[in-house]
C-alpha cells in the first residue's frame, strides 16, 4: 500500500447532540414504542398464531379491566415510585446505590418488629408513630453503612450495597423463622390479624388510597428538594464532579452520607407501607425486586421525580398486562416476558438517539 494512500473513513460517526426540545425527545420515545409494538405483533403472529390486537387488548384488560385491577395497578405504581424516589438522590450524585431492595426489607422488618412486639401494648396511634420512626431509622442506618465506608475509605459502593441486599435477606429470613406462625410453616402469617394493632388506617373502604397519597406527597417534596433546595444543588454539583464540589467548598463526604440517609429513610417508608398498610406481614420477597426495577425507572426519567410517575406506570402496566396474557391465552410466562423485554429494549435504546446522532460517510446524513 502506498504511504500517501488516504485512510478509509468509517461508515459513520457518532456525535453527541445538543439538548433536544422535550417535544422532540418524547416523539422519539413514542416512535420507539410504536416500533416495538409492531415487532411484538409480528412475533406474536409467527410464534403463537394469536391475533396481536387481541393480545394487546388483553394487556389493557389485565391492567384496567376492573376497578379492583385499576387500584392494584395504582398501588403497585405507588410502591415502585416510592423506591424510585429513594434511589434517585444517590444516583443523581453518582453514588450507585444498588441496595434499595435491602433497605426496603430492613424498613419492613423494623415495621413488623414493632407490630409483633408492641401490638396491644400501646394505643394504635402511638404504635403507628413508633413504626414510622423505626422504619425510617432502620432504612437510613442500613443505607448509611456503605455511604460511610465510601466517604471514609473510598470503597466500591456498587458491590457494597449489592452485598448488603443478601445480608438483609438473611436477617429477614432469620426473624421470619423466629416468629413463624404456625410453627414449621416458614411464614409468620398476617400480623395482629384479630386486633389490627399497627395496621395503617384506611381512607374510607379503600386500602390503597393512603399509600398512593403518601407517595404522591413524597414525589412533590422530592421534586422540590432536588430542583430548588440547597441540598439538591449540592447533590447535582457532587454528581457532576467531586473535584469541582471540593473546589467551591462543599464537604463531599457530608453530602454523600446525608444523601444516603435520605435514600435509606425513604426506602424505609416503602417498607413501612408494604408491611403496615398493604400486606400486614413480612417475608424475604416483600420488596418484589422493586429495588432493582427502581434503578431503571430513575434512569429513564433522568432523575426527574415527576417523569418517574410515567416510567413507573409504563413498567407496572407491562407487568400486569404480561401476566394477563399468560393467563388468558395459556402461553408460557416466558413469551409475555419477551414482549415486555422488547418494549423496554426499544425504550432504553431510544435514549441513545435522544443523546446522540449518526453522521454517515459521504452524505453525512444525520439520523434524528
Q: Could you say what each language-model-derived stretch is?
A:
Residues 261-267, 273-341:
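Transmembrane alpha-helical segments in multi-pass inner-membrane proteins
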Residues 204-281, 305-306:
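Helix-loop-helix "hairpin" substructures at the membrane interface of multi-pass membrane proteins
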Residues 49-54, 91-110, 151-160, 234, ...:
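Short, non-helical or kinked segments that cap or interrupt transmembrane helices
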Residues 39-61, 179-190:
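Interfacial/capping segments of alpha-helical transmembrane domains
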Residues 157, 161-228, 366-367:
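Transmembrane helix-bundle core of multi-pass membrane transporters
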Residues 77-88, 109, 140-144, 163-166, ...:
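Hydrophobic alpha-helical segments embedded in the membrane of multi-pass proteins
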Residues 1-33, 41, 240, 247-254, ...:
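Cytosolic-side transmembrane-helix boundaries in multi-pass membrane proteins
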Residues 44-48, 54, 58, 63-118, ...:
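Single transmembrane alpha-helix segments in multi-pass membrane proteins
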Amino acid at each position: 500500500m502506498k504511504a500517501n494512500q488516504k485512510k478509509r473513513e468509517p461508515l459513520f460517526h457518532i456525535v453527541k447532540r445538543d439538548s433536544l426540545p422535550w417535544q422532540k425527545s418524547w416523539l422519539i420515545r413514542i416512535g420507539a414504542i410504536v416500533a416495538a409494538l409492531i415487532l411484538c405483533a409480528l412475533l406474536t403472529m409467527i410464534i403463537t398464531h394469536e391475533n396481536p390486537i387481541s393480545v394487546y387488548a388483553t394487556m389493557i384488560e389485565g391492567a384496567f379491566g376492573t376497578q379492583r385491577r385499576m387500584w392494584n395497578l395504582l398501588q403497585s405504581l405507588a410502591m415502585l415510585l416510592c423506591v424510585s424516589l429513594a434511589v434517585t438522590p444517590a444516583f443523581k450524585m453518582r453514588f450507585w446505590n444498588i441496595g434499595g431492595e435491602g433497605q426496603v426489607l430492613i424498613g419492613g422488618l423494623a415495621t413488623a418488629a414493632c407490630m409483633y412486639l408492641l401490638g396491644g401494648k400501646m394505643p394504635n396511634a402511638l404504635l403507628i408513630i413508633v413504626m414510622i420512626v423505626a422504619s425510617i431509622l432502620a432504612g437510613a442506618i442500613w443505607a448509611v453503612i456503605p455511604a460511610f465506608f465510601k466517604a471514609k475509605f473510598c470503597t466500591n459502593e456498587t458491590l457494597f450495597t449489592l452485598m448488603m441486599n443478601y445480608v438483609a435477606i438473611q436477617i429477614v429470613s432469620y426473624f421470619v423463622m423466629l416468629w413463624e406462625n404456625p410453627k414449621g410453616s416458614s411464614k409468620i402469617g398476617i400480623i395482629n390479624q384479630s386486633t389490627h394493632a399497627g395496621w395503617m388506617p384506611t381512607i374510607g373502604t379503600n386500602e390503597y388510597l393512603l399509600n398512593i397519597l403518601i407517595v404522591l406527597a413524597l414525589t412533590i417534596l422530592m421534586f422540590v428538594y432536588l430542583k430548588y433546595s440547597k441540598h439538591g444543588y449540592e447533590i447535582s454539583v457532587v454528581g457532576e464532579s467531586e473535584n469541582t464540589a471540593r473546589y467551591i467548598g462543599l464537604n463531599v463526604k457530608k453530602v454523600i452520607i446525608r444523601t444516603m440517609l435520605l435514600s435509606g429513610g425513604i426506602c424505609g417508608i416503602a417498607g413501612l407501607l408494604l408491611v403496615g398498610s398493604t400486606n400486614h406481614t413480612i417475608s424475604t420477597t416483600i420488596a418484589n425486586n422493586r429495588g432493582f426495577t427502581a434503578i431503571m425507572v430513575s434512569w429513564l426519567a433522568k432523575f426527574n421525580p415527576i417523569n418517574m410517575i410515567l416510567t413507573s406506570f409504563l413498567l407496572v402496566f407491562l407487568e400486569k398486562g404480561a401476566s394477563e396474557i399468560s393467563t388468558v391465552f395459556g402461553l408460557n410466562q416466558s413469551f409475555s416476558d419477551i414482549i415486555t423485554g422488547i418494549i423496554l429494549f426499544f425504550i432504553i435504546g431510544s435514549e441513545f438517539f435522544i443523546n446522540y446522532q449518526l453522521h454517515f460517510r459521504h452524505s453525512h446524513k444525520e439520523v434524528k
